């Protein structure tokens, strides 16, 4: 299939919400209007020519309704990913759409929990046949890349539970060395990506800066 039914802008933090709490300041990223120096790369768009829809974008309404009009009713809470699997989404990294960032950890956790519930509701689209509108069963039309995106979201949703289970098992059923090793491993999984990202920000600067 050629072309896109959805064009997905990059999502940024709105200025009013950026000063709402320390939680937003720490985890919300950089606010402001600067689409040119903050253009980012996206693995899926760069390698496969297809991005992921996050719920707000530019639609070809007729094509969207034609391709996404056969979902089962009242069965999908988070519809963004499955819609981009059917309709193909192109990322516009130099166009920014601003939205509020959750002001507290509880609000952010609630949002992520809602997203994860939605991801598990579309897990059936990993199978060869899926439920369509009503009770009819259809051949699953989405691509292998789309199925990988669904699987990857499910994998990421299980990481916190798996790490907690690893810590509990190591501390309750293993020796002190295994417990310490498991703790160091989990801390490394959580901290190293953030530390590397922070270090990269310190040692590099945009090419347009003196």
What do these predicted ranges mean?
Residues 1-140:
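Internal catalytic domains of large membrane-associated glycosyltransferases
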Residues 3-7, 13, 31-32, 36, ...:
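Aromatic-residue detector
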Residues 46-52, 71-78, 105-108, 147-158, ...:
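Membrane-entry segments of alpha-helical transmembrane domains in multi-pass membrane proteins
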Residues 133-162:
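Loop-to-transmembrane boundary segments
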Residues 155-210:
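Membrane-embedded multi-pass helical conduit in multi-pass membrane proteins
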